Swiss-Prot record:
It comes from the Bacteria. The gene is uxaB. Belongs to the mannitol dehydrogenase family. UxaB subfamily. Coiled coil: none annotated. This is Altronate oxidoreductase.
Length: 483
């Protein structure tokens, strides 16, 4: 069986116009996959050079396959049908290591055609590293490497205004474009680079903040033999991902034309502010996960897919989204509903086995950031507590007993909550405190909730009633009236 390379698998090759920091699965099944579609269907005509930003030889370089690899996109499509689509990606030309090919790295700045910089250097990547110097070959941090590359371009083209770049980070931090820009400016000032360069950074370059959304499951280790048999070739860089994807870019409207998004419809939005889209994702996608986990797990289920195929649990989650979360969010209702419908489809994806216990990690913080804002907004606007979000809080407190049907399970959270719950549930079992007192102690933790939740009218009583129902009847019976 042949391994992928451009000699045995000839096809389109595009001029290099995109630099990408990061060789990982996510960018390859997200950005490079989208670039490949745009190259095929429009005149974008842009090849990618991947820069490996860290010093490691594992996995090996994409250049061993001449930049070629296969994505397998699978999940439920818009009609709810299970689909699996293999695509040979030709958008990546080569990969270089900034550590062993530093001169080659700087040379990227000399190419007049270079226009875009994408990156995913993990959440920790957009950060300041105190020891980084201009002459380091290379500097440690990604922002310092980028500053050096931008200065190389500025110098090579004598500060030409039309040679700036559009910089689009995909790291999962809030306003990632702003954060990256601030660090680049910080290094430029620290390294005493000329004022003209700092002006050029501001005037000729765009730093765009983004929201990225796609579950990328990466190299399908358990299915490789079967998949390669179907494909007819060996591919050491196979990359699997879900069907859904969303790319929200806060940037100039002209970006849509530059990326040829006006010529081929991708799920990419160019917006003035990513904040409402971030809130939508946190409230609907992450919020639904957080509401679902303690309810479904204590109802005897183990994965998100099982939960969504369970008529009662699925109804509980969908009603929580449509009746309690969406009404308090600040975006057009039709946009929110179409996003919600995509979310429930993603939860049903038969190709992804998402363990409820792995999502349960740090559940107390997740509840505070993902569900509490909607619970409080609902109470404020209607004068009544949203029944399902309140029940989810009771289910969460019950979850920290760490016991299901007489068997224990691991609970992962910070030490404070693990100790607190161990103490509270032990006191409850020994009848030292009642359910209402237990709930009041949890809700009074100002340091965690950033307010005293016992002051929210009716919340302690409602959560205590729900918790008693869970303890007395079991989760299935307790949740049924809300399904």
């Amino acid at each position: 069986m042949k391994t992928l390379n451009r000699r045995d698998f000839p096809g389109a090759q595009y001029p290099e116009r995109i630099i990408q920091f990061g060789e990982g699965n996510f960018l390859r099944a997200f950005v490079d996959w989208q670039i490949d579609l745009l190259n095929e269907h429009t005149d974008l005509n842009s090849g990618v050079v991947v820069v490996r930003p860290i010093e490691t030889s594992f996995p090996p370089s994409l250049s061993t396959q001449d930049g070629l690899y296969t994505t397998i996109i699978r999940g439920l499509n818009e009609k709810g049908e299970a689909v699996s689509d293999a695509r040979l990606i030709r958008s990546v030309n080569r990969e270089i290591s900034v550590y062993s090919e530093y001169d080659e790295f700087l040379k990227l700045a000399h190419n007049p055609e270079m226009r875009f910089v994408f990156s995913n250097t993990t959440e920790a990547g957009i950060s300041y590293h105190a020891g980084d110097k201009f002459d380091d070959a290379p500097a440690v941090s990604y922002p310092a490497k980028l500053t050096r590359l931008l200065f190389e371009r500025f110098s090579h083209f004598n500060g030409a205004q039309d040679k700036g770049w559009i910089i689009i980070p995909c790291e999962l931090i809030d306003y990632n474009g702003d954060a990256l820009r601030e660090l680049v400016l910080r290094y430029a000032q620290e390294w005493a680079l000329p004022e003209a360069f700092i002006q050029w950074l501001d005037q000729a370059n765009s730093f765009c903040s983004t929201l990225v959304d796609r579950i990328v499951t990466g190299y399908p280790r358990d299915e490789v033999a079967k998949l390669e048999e179907e494909l007819g070739y060996h591919d050491g860089f196979l990359d699997t991902a879900e069907h859904f994807y969303l790319f929200v870019i806060q940037g100039p409207k002209s970006l849509a034309t530059e990326l040829r998004l006006d010529k081929y419809p991708l799920n990419v939005l160019i917006v003035d502010d990513i904040k409402p889209y971030k809130e939508r994702k946190v409230a609907i996608l992450n919020g639904a996960h957080t509401a679902l986990v303690p309810v479904a797990f204590q109802a005897g289920l183990d994965t998100v897919g099982e939960a969504m195929n369970d008529a009662e649990i699925c109804a509980f989650v969908e009603k929580a989204i449509y009746e309690e979360i969406i009404p308090v969010l600040d975006l057009p209702r039709d946009e929110l509903e179409s996003f919600a419908s995509a979310v429930t489809g993603r939860f049903r994806n038969p190709y992804i086995k998402h363990q409820l216990l792995s999502i349960a990690l740090n559940g107390m913080t997740k509840f505070r950031t993902r569900i509490l804002p909607q619970l409080l907004a609902g109470q404020k606007s209607n004068g009544t507590l949203p029944a399902r979000l309140t029940f989810a809080l009771a289910a969460l407190i019950a979850f920290y007993r760490g016991e299901r049907n007489g068997e224990t399970y691991p609970v992962q959270d910070d030490a404070h909550w693990l100790e607190r719950y161990q103490q509270l549930w032990s006191q409850h079992r020994n009848r030292v405190i009642g359910t209402q007192e237990l709930v009041a102690i949890v809700l009074a933790e100002k340091d965690h909730w950033e307010q005293d939740l016992t002051q929210v009218p009716g919340l302690v009583e409602q959560v205590a009633n729900d918790l008693d129902a869970i303890l007395e009847k079991g989760m299935r019976e307790a949740v049924r009236p809300l399904c």
